[in-house]
């Protein structure tokens, strides 16, 4: 079910998730972990129009958990933390039906 996802940035994870295809509509797991649910402060959905790019975002103290149940999205990550072992590392991670999972 998908592509290999190699991540170079320390602290970033790709957690493979399951999806169940059904002719009536597919089912996508997002999480079964109690600690994931307990720590949620905000949940929102976003769309990206085909061929468009959404702006770079810089988060200093935020952990995001991203899932792409419809379509395919390429996330480009850069480690700008000067005190990080992976300082200046860059990752391109593609998430979608062929590589379904949660990016943390």
Tell what function each PLM region has.
Residues 1-99:
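Non-catalytic, conserved peripheral segments adjacent to functional cores
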Residues 100-104:
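Short, intrinsically disordered, charge-balanced linker/junction segments flanking boundaries
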């Amino acid at each position: 079910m998908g592509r290999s996802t190699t991540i170079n940035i320390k602290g970033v994870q790709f957690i493979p998730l399951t999806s169940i295809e059904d002719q009536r509509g597919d089912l996508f797991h997002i999480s079964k972990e109690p600690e994931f649910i307990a720590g949620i402060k905000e949940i929102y959905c976003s769309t990206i129009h085909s061929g468009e790019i959404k702006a770079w975002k810089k988060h200093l103290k935020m952990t995001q958990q991203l899932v792409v149940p419809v379509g395919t999205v390429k996330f480009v990550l850069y480690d700008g933390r000067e005190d990080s072992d992976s300082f200046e590392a860059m990752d391109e991670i593609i998430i979608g039906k062929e590589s379904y999972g949660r990016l943390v």
